[in-house]
Amino acid sequence: MPLKPGSRVLVGSSGAAQGGSPLSGGYAGAKRTQIFMVNYSQKESDRLGLDLRFTALAPRMIPDTDLGKHAVAGYSRYLGISEADFVKSMASPPTSSDVATAVLEVVTSSDHSKGKAFVVSGKGLEAVT
C-alpha cells in the first residue's frame, strides 16, 4: 500500500557509514547505501509532491549495548589497546538514551531543512553532508 501523505520513514543506519570500518567494510558500505537510498527517496517524494519524509539515523558505536560491547572488544583487539582506552579514544560516543532521544527528535520535528541523514553522538544530531 502507498504511504499516506505526511508519513515518515526512519531508516536505521550506522556511524560506520561515515568513516568505514576495517573490521566490517561490507557492513559500512551497506549502511552508506541506506543513506543514499534515503536521499534518493526524499528527492522523488519532493519531485512527485507526495509529502513523505525520509530520514536516516546513523548512531556512532554505542558502548553501553551488547552489540557495542562486542564492537569495542573487536576494535580494541584490532588496535592492540585495552577496551577502556578504546572507549576513552571515542569522540562523544552516544548512549542508548541519546539514540532514543534522537529518534524522538527526528520523528516529531516538522523542520525538514535540517537534513535527511544524521549521525548520532553523545552531542546529539549532526547532519550528514
Residue ranges and their predicted role:
Residues G6-G49, A58-T65, K69, A73:
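Catalytic loop of short-chain dehydrogenase/reductase
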Residues R8, R53-T55, S110:
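A general secondary-structure boundary signal
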Residues S13, F54-A56, V106:
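Generic alpha-helical hydrophobic packing signal
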Residues S76-T129:
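C-terminal helical subdomain
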Residues G25, A56, V87, A91:
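Conserved short-loop catalytic and cofactor-binding motifs
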Residues L50-L57, K116:
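Rossmann-like NAD(H)/NADP(H) cofactor-binding core
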Residues P2-L3:
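A generic alpha-to-beta junction signature in SAM-dependent methyltransferases
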